[in-house]
Amino acid sequence: MDVTSSSGGGDPRQIEETKPLLGSDVSGPEGTKVMGAVPCRRALLLCNGMRYKLLQEGDIQVCVIRHPRTFLSKILTSKFLRRWEPHHLTLADNSLASATPSGYMENSVSYSAIEDVQPLSWENAPKYCLQLTIPGGTVLLQAANSYLRDQWFHSLQWKKKIYKYKKVLSNPSRWEVVLKEIRTLVDMALTSPLQDDSINQAPLEIVSKLLSENTNLTTQEHENIIVAIAPLLENNHPPPDLCEFFCKHCRERPRSMVVIEVFTPVVQRILKHNMDFGKCPRLRLFTQEYILALNELNAGMEVVKKFIQSMHGPTGHCPHPRVLPNLVAVCLAAIYSCYEEFINSRDNSPSLKEIRNGCQQPCDRKPTLPLRLLHPSPDLVSQEATLSEPRLKSVVVASSEVHVEVERTSTAKPALTASTGNDSEPNLIDCLMVSPACGTMSIELGPQAGRTLGCHVEILKLLSDYDDWRPSLASLLQPIPFPKEALAHEKFTKELKYVIQRFAEDPRQEVHSCLLSVRAGKDGWFQLYSPGGVACDDDGELFASMVHILMGSCYKTKKFLLSLAENKLGPCMLLALRGNQTMAEILCLMLEYNIIDNNDTQLQIISTLESTDVGKRMYEQLCDRQRELKELQRKGGPTRLTLPSKSTDADLARLLSSGSFGNLENLSLAFTNVTSACAEHLIKLPSLKQLNLWSTQFGDAGLRLLSEHLTMLQVLNLCETPVTDAGLLALSSMKSLCSLNMNSTKLSADTYEDLKAKLPNLKEVDVRYTEAW
């Protein structure tokens, strides 16, 4: 093979500079000719739909042909003295370099020195080559096949043109020319046969750098550039600097059509595909500013509502799982920004200032944690307790099902209190409730902060209206991810009350259980919106709704009632006095489960129940149940009892109401149709020691109730029942269990290990066909 070239008339560099930057038909320098033993022609490269991955490096054969200027140099460059060298070439941002700089590639080849890139093919030889025209010669690259040759060709063309665009757009002179070049750059990226993230990101980064270095552009120039790069944003996130530019445009021109026509699909893509705003916070900020810009339109929140509807979709289930978490993240960050002025300034932060003055003596503040409520010293705590005896104190009663914040006065019974450690961090609700000044203080936000707060709280309301989003929304808001200043702000808690009400009205346990605290020692929405809580602005209607839904689910437990008796007995009695049916039921259960030991308090509860028709009716039913219970628990009757198969809860209730079962020790309900509802009857059997629930529909709710009342149970068979870890964990309170059958249940290995550690008398365990097997 003999390929030579000569530099004929005309300066090829001048020709290159005068050609359009994105010319698709690039011809070689004038006068260049290829000489050899066989004719050589330029290969006509047609993509025909082929796609290629952008090369960053690869192995290829290299040959450099210098343009002969003398007869001797022409002999030296003849085909007899020419050789091919293998090199591992790297396509850097500004040059083509070899991993082993030697021979032909001892020096890297700058993209600015490459005048032309063309594919070559020979008729009589299966060679696949590229010709790189450089000053004074030609660089030939030989690939193994035509696909690799084309891949190298497109990759080199891309690197070369991107390098030139970076130089051209780094020093703009006339903006109409710059805009034309940007459009051409975008077209090049869209029509490139290369597939790589950088194909679209590189032009965006070039434009982003251009905008960051030229801040004196007019509004019209801003919009023209945004429209020009819009096609690239359809499938790509904007770079950080470009996000900042978009944010500025949203703030300065919220009514611009660019916001609706260009930014809407960009924000939709961000909400659908973004996985972590922590890695790209400017995307979140851009989304926030876009939503605020929509809110500034004439229709205001109606436009925002339509946008949320478009994100959810027309069906009952949103097909994009990332939309809700991303929207919530945007709302939380926006709400935090509303109180940022208070948070960053002690003097202008009445919430923190008043909390410190009311709860603690002045103490040093950690400079790295300006929002942290510091741990009080034991001496300061004792001094405060001496100075304010009647002050409310915080006590936590915790269970595996529910954690309720208990407030006690100095006259409450010490038997029901549980002390917290002196080294624990002050409870948020205590801090907001302990000082009278905190209850009357008001936080005033500026006009812009007020609009931001109202807009994003309204979005949370809209999100809570979607049934499929409500479980995830409740889970995300369960830890109360709002600043302390927001919880002290009456406007915020009043607006957010709608969201909490939606949670309280949802019958799904996964939703309304999120009203409770996320773990022991922390506060939940149940505490904030209960009477006496910092966010309670009514007479307990929301509190009654929350208690009603929790009692109707699986929280009708002695621990839950004990917590209410300790914490909210007064509000419960007041609401029952006003005819609230749920509160009347609560008071009856307190009497039935012997939660209240004080006789005077019991008489007061009875008087409260008898003061209303609904309460009187429930109390009469309670008295009837108590008489039946005494008859049921009267000594006598069988010691063993087996119900026929297919028996139901009603059959069991009818049987137990027919006589005395005070001696019943062994009850078999195997292969019956009983459910968790029968637990209310089983807990009335005082002598029960063995219970067989094999192949029944007895579930977690019933298991939790049994664990609280039948603490003397010794043998329990749960084989082939639908119980899960949520119910099985409650068995840890049955210290007398000797035999436990959990065959074919949804028992996990961790729960099994936990039960073994907490049940010291357990000797026989069946965990076959479970995860723990």
Swiss-Prot record:
Role, per record: Plays a role in T-cell signaling pathway.
First-listed, main subcellular location of the protein, grouped into a coarse class: nucleus
One GO term describing the cellular component: cytosol
Gene3D superfamilies xrefs: Ribonuclease Inhibitor (3.80.10.10)
The keyword Phosphoprotein is assigned to this record: yes
Record-given protein name: C-Maf-inducing protein
UniProtKB keywords: Cytoplasm, Leucine-rich repeat, Nucleus, Phosphoprotein, Repeat
LRR repeat intervals: 663-686, 687-707, 712-732, 736-756
A Pfam family this chain is assigned to: PH_21
Region (Disordered) location: 1-28
Compartmental location: Nucleus; Cytoplasm
Assembly and binders: Interacts with FLNA.
Biological processes, Gene Ontology terms: in utero embryonic development
Domain PH: 54-163
CDD domains: PH
Taxonomy, superkingdom: Eukaryota
PTM-bearing positions, type Phosphoserine: S349, S377, S382, S660
